[in-house]
Amino acid sequence: MSLSLEQSPTTGDEVITNYTINFGPQHPAAHGVLRMVMELDGEIIERIDPHVGLLHRGTEKLIEHKTYLQALPYFDRLDYCSPLGMEHSYVLAVEKLLNIEVPLRAQYLRVLFAELTRICNHMLNLGSHVMDVGAMTPNLWLFEIREDCLNFFERASGARMHSAWFRPGGVHQDVPLKLLTDMADWIDERLHPLFDDAMSLVVDNRIFKQRNVDIAVVSKEDALRWGFSGPMIRGSGIPWDLRKSQPYDVYDRMEFDIPVGTSGDCYDRFMVRVEEVRQSARIMKQCIEQMPDGPVASTDRKVVPPKRAEMKQSMEALIHHFKLYTEGFHVPAGEVYVATESPKGEFGVYLVSDGSNKPYRCKIRPTAFSHLQAMDFMCKGHMLPDATAILGAIDVVFGECDR
C-alpha cells in the first residue's frame, strides 16, 4: 500500500513555514563575528545569507594616510593567525614598485618563517575544526605546537603575533645564532611526533568521518566558478598553488608536493591541510640546510634604514635614519598586484603609487571573502550541525575578511 502525501503541509488555518534563525555573531563556532541568517526546514538548511563586515576597520583607507613603512603593521592585524603571510604580499608589492634587490639570506628567512606561519595557522584551524565537531584532545595537543611556533616568532622578531618583521628590502633583523638549529631539532623531535599523534586520533575516527565525509562536496568546476583558492581549491582536486605556479622569493629552489583532494568534501579539505603541515616542515628543513650567509636587508640606503652601530659613527647615517622614520621613502609612480599563497589561500595586494611617500591606494584581496560567498551553495540540503563543519573547513578569520 502506498501512502499519499499532500503537496502542501498546510492544514486548516495553520500555515507551516520555515524557521529563520540567526547563527552568530556571538556563536563560538562562527570563528569570529560572522552572522548567518539561516532558513531551516526542520533541521535541514534551505538557505544561508552570510552577513560580513562586523569587523570592518577601514584598513585600506587608513593605509592611504600612512607612509609605506607605517602601513606594514596593519597587515599583521588582518589575518592575525598568520601575520607574516599577510606582510609577505605587501613587502613584495612595495619591492616590485621600488625595483630593489632583496639579499638571498633575507629571501630564505622569509620563506622559512612563511612556512612556520603556515604550520602555526593550520594548528589553529585543524584543532578548532576537530573541536567544532566534538573532539577535545587533539586541539590541546595542536596548541602545544602552535605555542612553539609563537616562541620562534618571538625569538626572531621580539613579538609573538604582530611581528612586523618582514620589511621592504628584506627583514628587520637577523635571527639569533641558535634559532635555526633549534628549529631543525624541533621539526624532527617535536613537530612530527606530536602532530602524528594528534592526527592519529581523528583521521580514521568513525565519528569524525561521519561528520565530514560527503559534506559540502564542491566539484572542480564549481570551485573555479566560486573563485576558491588555497586548501579550498586543492581539496576539490585542482593542484593550484602560487608557490609553484608563480614562485616568489626562493620557492623555485624548494622541493615540495602539492596535496590535492579526490572528492572535494570537508574531509578532503581537512586532509589537504594535514599534508600541507608536513610539506611546510619539508620546506623549512631545506631552508635551514641551504641558508646562506650575508646581509638580511637591501643595501639601498634610500629605502632601508642604517644599523645602530653605523649611526653612532656617521652623520649621513643619522640623517638617513631620521628621514626614513619621519618622512619615509618615496616610491616611483605605478601600480602593481602581488599575490602570495597565504595559509588560507591567495592573498593579494593591489598597490597604486603616485610617487609620494604614502600609497595612493592599497586594495587588499582577502581569501575568506570568496569562500564565504559559497556558504549558501555548500550548505544547502545539509543538516544544521553540518554548517559548523563546513565553516571550520573554510578556515575564515574576520580581521582579513572584513579588512
From Swiss-Prot:
It is found in: Cell inner membrane. Pfam families: Complex1_49kDa. GO terms for molecular function: NAD binding; NADH:ubiquinone reductase (non-electrogenic) activity; quinone binding. Signal peptide: none annotated. It is a peripheral membrane protein. One of its GO terms (cellular component) is plasma membrane. It catalyses: a quinone + NADH + 5 H(+)(in) = a quinol + NAD(+) + 4 H(+)(out). It is an enzyme of class 7 (translocase). Keywords: Cell inner membrane, Cell membrane, Membrane, NAD, Quinone, Translocase, Transport, Ubiquinone. PROSITE patterns: COMPLEX1_49K. Its EC number is 7.1.1.-. Belongs to the complex I 49 kDa subunit family. NCBIfam families: NuoD, PRK06075.1. NDH-1 is composed of 14 different subunits. Subunits NuoB, C, D, E, F, and G constitute the peripheral sector of the complex. NDH-1 shuttles electrons from NADH, via FMN and iron-sulfur (Fe-S) centers, to quinones in the respiratory chain. The immediate electron acceptor for the enzyme in this species is believed to be ubiquinone. Couples the redox reaction to proton translocation (for every two electrons transferred, four hydrogen ions are translocated across the cytoplasmic membrane), and thus conserves the redox energy in a proton gradient. This is NADH-quinone oxidoreductase subunit D. It comes from Novosphingobium aromaticivorans (strain ATCC 700278 / DSM 12444 / CCUG 56034 / CIP 105152 / NBRC 16084 / F199). The lineage of its organism: Bacteria, Pseudomonadati, Pseudomonadota, Alphaproteobacteria, Sphingomonadales. The gene is nuoD.
